[in-house]
Amino acid sequence: MDYYNYAGGFGANDLKIALSLSIAKVGIGRLFYVREKMMNLLMCPVCRHTLSLTDQTWRCLNHHSYDVAKQGYVNLHVVQHKHSKNPGDTAESVQARRAFLSAGFYAPLQQAVVEKIRALKIETLLDIGCGEGYYTAAMQAEVQQCVGVDIAKNAVQVAAKLNKNVVWVVGTGATLPVLDGCIDLCSSLFSPIPEQEILRVLKPHGYLLVVTPANGHLYALREALFEEVNPHQPQKFVEQLQGNFNLVEQWIVDAPLMLPQTALKHLIAMTPYAYKAKPERRQALEQNEHLSLNAQFQLYLFKKK
């Protein structure tokens, strides 16, 4: 029985059963080692004290409380931190991304990220901008504790159905919902990088994994949608982070695509191109029954100085 499920919402009876089974299976010494390795990672967004889970509610010592939703996530994006009623991705873009990614088109990237996490042998991971959870759910299998946070509640609701061993949180990068110095690796895949907050939550010499579009990413798609194609500038992240992080490794992952019409529509809908492109150009492109593209991803692994 997986201990991390307890962090996701076991009741008292479930915990007793888990303890009994674990004692029988691994012995009392190993059991206490496992329990010691697990820790509460979440931080109260109001007073910044540790949150503990009891009876499907996260509480801090100052009695601020946050209920776990029926879908399995907790909302730590407090009202005073919101700038709009429904921040983040739209429901349409979330559903389009879920359909596109679940079809496996970006599987080479998912595999590359998982392999890197496995090689680092880390214990705690925070995925910033987890979205609908495609990458987060896969990374979780390589660590002891995994937290996925996104500002879009509709995305986290979808993510929470994928993997019950992830602690799914609605939250903001401006105040990451985890405690100081408790994370081995922060990941940011196609998401903003709140550098100071990442520095706060990372352990000494912790890692930051950044994934961003490489120069050639979806070039044919952008060429069809826009009169002028502006190149992606992945190197800007190296320049941005060089003061507080050492660049450990950088590499590119290519994913050649042959998209049927439905997948093409999903791809457009899940990107900013959906609202940046002129409607007539988007409609013309979506008439294609098939489209050949190359997805190209730039990956950076940084280490906190």
Predicted regions and their residues:
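N-terminal auxiliary segments of SAM/dcSAM-dependent transferases
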Residues: R35-N86
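Conserved class I S-adenosyl-L-methionine
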Residues: K121-G131
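Conserved SAM-binding loop of SAM-dependent methyltransferases across substrates and taxa
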Residues: E132-V143
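Conserved SAM/SAH-binding beta-strand->alpha-helix loop
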Residues: A152-N154
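Conserved SAM-binding strand-loop segment of SAM-dependent methyltransferases
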Residues: K164-L176
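A short acidic, Gly/Pro-enriched loop at the edge of an enzyme's catalytic core
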Residues: A174-L185
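A short glycine-rich, Lys/Arg-flanked "PGG" loop and its adjoining helix->strand segment in the class I
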Residues: E195-L209
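Conserved Class I S-adenosyl-L-methionine
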Residues: V253-K305
